[in-house]
From Swiss-Prot:
InterPro entries: CASP/CASPL, CASP_dom
Localization, UniProt: Cell membrane
Family note: Belongs to the Casparian strip membrane proteins (CASP) family.
Topological domains annotated Extracellular: 42-63, 121-143
Gene Ontology CC terms: plasma membrane
Organism listed in the record: Vitis vinifera
Protein name per its UniProtKB record: CASP-like protein 2D1
Assembly information from the UniProt record: Homodimer and heterodimers.
Length: 186
């Protein structure tokens, strides 16, 4: 029995630490995503010259709100599922789901980053002037929401690495072709 414990790919001492880090990161994602949603949805500014600007006027912000909602919901479900005995052994499920969430967070963050770039710099080639001088408070709140979204993304990137470690540590390391040839020869 002791030989089995010694040859296990993941030592039992790492599991509680890894599980604690995993759960902590998932729990951190929830308030970060909720704060991102709240900052974005309540963001609006009225300008006497150009009119009212709301988050719903910009598709990239709506996309970020949707992805933030999905990430908060997924993080909550994943925290609960990580303590359910029958789902704990589903390392592939967490691996694939964490990868998907990380990619979705990257795409939504990139969409908002593009909006902010155009809002701050404009695009003279297509006659778009910068807008943040007229809507400074709106741009500042979007910046803050994007920063919170980026922190949630960092949590998912670490979670993706942890779940990849869990999945791939279940398998033996690859054998080099020389070792295979030597084994066949003997």
């Amino acid at each position: 029995m002791s030989n089995l414990a010694e040859t296990a790919p993941i030592s039992s001492a790492h599991i509680p630490t890894l599980k604690l880090i995993d759960c902590s990161l998932r729990l951190c994602v929830i308030p970060l995503s909720v704060a991102t949603i709240w900052l974005t949805v309540t963001n609006q500014q009225d300008n006497s010259i150009y009119g009212k600007l709301e988050f719903s006027n910009l598709t990239g912000l709506k996309y970020m709100v949707c992805i933030s909602g999905i990430s908060a919901g997924y993080a909550l479900v994943a925290v609960v599922a990580s303590w359910v005995r029958c789902l704990v052994n589903k390392a592939w499920l967490f691996f694939v789901s964490d990868q998907i969430m990380a990619y979705l967070m990257v795409t939504s963050g990139a969409a908002v980053l593009e909006i902010l770039y155009l809002a701050y710099k404009g695009d003279r080639g297509v006659s778009w002037s910068e807008a943040c001088s007229s809507y400074g408070r709106f741009c500042s709140r979007v910046n803050l929401a994007l920063a919170l979204h980026a922190l949630a993304l960092c949590c998912f990137l670490v979670l993706a690495v942890i779940s990849a470690y869990r999945v791939f540590s279940m398998f033996e390391p690859p054998v080099s072709s020389k070792e295979v040839e030597e084994e066949r020869a003997s």
